[in-house]
């Protein structure tokens, strides 16, 4: 989910995942495999949000066509999109403005957006209706489970992860999305030669991203460190505000080894 970089206190208001031993009830008989699945890092933290009338209308009218229900099986994505085309996954599209803009400028590619928060889903559907975009599909579910169960290995042409929650406090860094195990899962779904593009406005997170992505043997950095912002990624309103305040933004673009 795209965060507001100026809302630095927000993570402290969020519920803490019950992954610590003291949060487990006495005598818990949960099987070890199930308990491990329950405790692992998820790609999101639940936030409340109000769905506007326009967003709700878009969900009612366009959701049946463009929202793909989560299912523990791999759909025929060519049938879902109605064609065979390069496919890009975006994890955490926030309110969808960036997703819609990129999709509008790349009509020959298909975009699969994963977002758990309902207002964001409604907002993107509303933009799709206003701009007559048909090359986007949405899954409202945890990205980890989507990758594991709905995306085939070596099938994606690109992945976008723009401004994920930075979990700015050191004790919360373990909750960050870009971790070695998640990156390994992500890379397994990329085609050889496909790209992974991450962006963040937190320098500490950018440094962690660079370290984690650089340590993944299947990835190669396209730049000497951080990459210039690719032209296809628009500057967000939060980014503009941050830049006016002197804040930095870091883009990282890696490719999966093995092409050609």
From Swiss-Prot:
Look up the domain of life of the source.
Bacteria
Cellular component, GO, one term? tRNA methyltransferase complex
Active site at 165
UniProt enzyme class: transferase
One annotated GO molecular function is: tRNA (guanine(46)-N7)-methyltransferase activity
Annotated region Disordered: the residues are: 1-37
EC? 2.1.1.33
Q: Which residues bind S-adenosyl-L-methionine per the record?
A: 90, 115, 142, 165
Its pathway, per UniProt, is: tRNA modification; N(7)-methylguanine-tRNA biosynthesis
Q: Where does this protein hold substrate?
A: 169, 201, 236-239
Check the record and name the SUPFAM superfamilies matching this protein: S-adenosyl-L-methionine-dependent methyltransferases
Q: Which reaction does it catalyse?
A: guanosine(46) in tRNA + S-adenosyl-L-methionine = N(7)-methylguanosine(46) in tRNA + S-adenosyl-L-homocysteine
The protein's UniProt keywords, in alphabetical order, are:
Methyltransferase, S-adenosyl-L-methionine, Transferase, tRNA processing
Under the heading NCBIfam families, the entry gives: tRNA (guanosine(46)-N7)-methyltransferase TrmB (TIGR00091)
Family affiliation: Belongs to the class I-like SAM-binding methyltransferase superfamily. TrmB family.
Give a short account of what the protein does: Catalyzes the formation of N(7)-methylguanine at position 46 (m7G46) in tRNA.
Q: Return the protein name.
A: tRNA (guanine-N(7)-)-methyltransferase
Show the taxonomic lineage.
Bacteria, Pseudomonadati, Pseudomonadota, Betaproteobacteria, Burkholderiales
